[in-house]
């Protein structure tokens, strides 16, 4: 008998539509509701969260007992819809049956962070490392989460730095920990050191836009303006909805005296944050100058 999960996930790596076709055809031919769980996963990957939830619910109604996979998919879909209470219930359902289930535990940590329960998030990371066997990647990822929580949310950069270093010691390919160290160094105005960390992170994962943004900011502070726009463009291409990048790019265009282009990007910033009086006034001033 074929391993449905294994085949589905192998296809999913290369082609979401083919993976969905495999699960859909499998359900039509066999009536096996397990296929619906994987259909739900395919919907989740594409961002069709309501469809993912409906597919999981139907699978359970038809007798599928693959609760771990199903509730993890449903929980993630609910999380992406901002339904945190319902999402938490799904992941807690998984951990009640399998306390060591790593994915569900990491999503519960993510929920704590989103709901500003930062100490709870850190405690969950520590408890998991103390109570369950972790491979090096899991250990590194949990240390990385602790680092970012201390750095961004709890304003304790020194403990954050320690966590990032421990994360890298466990797994030298944890790009996000190098990014964290880059932010740490940049906050202390050690821009050359920060750039080194951001570049190391890019070597590991070239698709994390925060590293290009960090390099752009550091070069701006070092007055290396020749490369600032290049790195902001790269950052924006990867993080299209990050308003920090758009605003910084607008100011770079303004520095280059490309006022018309700058105005358009400032307006984009304003669409995301209409209460930004400073940007609103700046646009008005630039438009007046442009009329002269």
Stretch-by-stretch model annotation:
Residues 33-34, 67-69, 102-103, 136-140, ...:
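Helix-start (N-cap) detector for alpha-helical repeat units in TPR-like alpha-solenoids
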Residues 8, 41, 76, 110, ...:
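Residue-level recognition of tetratricopeptide repeat
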Residues 25-26, 58-60, 93-94, 127-132, ...:
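Canonical positions in the second alpha-helix
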């Amino acid at each position: 008998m074929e391993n449905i999960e294994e085949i589905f996930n192998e296809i999913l790596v290369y082609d979401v539509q083919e993976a969905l076709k495999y699960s859909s055809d499998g359900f039509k031919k066999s009536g096996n509701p397990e296929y619906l769980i994987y259909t739900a996963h395919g919907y989740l990957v594409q961002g069709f969260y309501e469809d993912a939830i409906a597919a999981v619910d139907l699978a359970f109604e038809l007798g599928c007992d693959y609760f771990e996979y199903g509730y993890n998919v449903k929980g993630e879909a609910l999380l992406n819809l901002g339904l945190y209470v319902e999402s938490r219930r799904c992941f807690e359902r998984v951990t009640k049956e399998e306390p060591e289930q790593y994915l569900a535990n990491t999503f519960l940590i993510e929920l704590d962070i989103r709901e500003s329960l930062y100490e709870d998030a850190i405690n969950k990371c520590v408890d998991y490392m103390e109570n369950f066997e972790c491979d090096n990647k899991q250990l590194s990822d949990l240390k990385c989460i602790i680092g970012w929580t201390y750095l961004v949310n709890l304003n304790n950069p020194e403990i954050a730095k320690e966590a990032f270093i421990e994360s890298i010691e466990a797994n030298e390919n944890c790009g996000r920990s190098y990014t964290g160290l880059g932010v740490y160094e940049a906050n202390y105005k050690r821009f050359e050191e920060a750039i080194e960390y951001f570049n190391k992170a890019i070597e590991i994962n070239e698709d994390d836009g925060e590293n290009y943004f960090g390099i752009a900011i550091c070069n701006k502070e070092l007055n290396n303006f020749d490369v600032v726009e290049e790195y902001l463009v790269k950052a924006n291409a990867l993080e299209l909805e990050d308003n920090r990048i758009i605003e910084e790019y607008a100011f770079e265009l303004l520095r280059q005296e490309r006022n018309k282009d700058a105005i358009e990007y400032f307006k984009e910033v304003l669409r995301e944050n209409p209460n930004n009086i400073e940007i609103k006034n700046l646009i008005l001033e630039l438009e007046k100058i442009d009329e002269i």
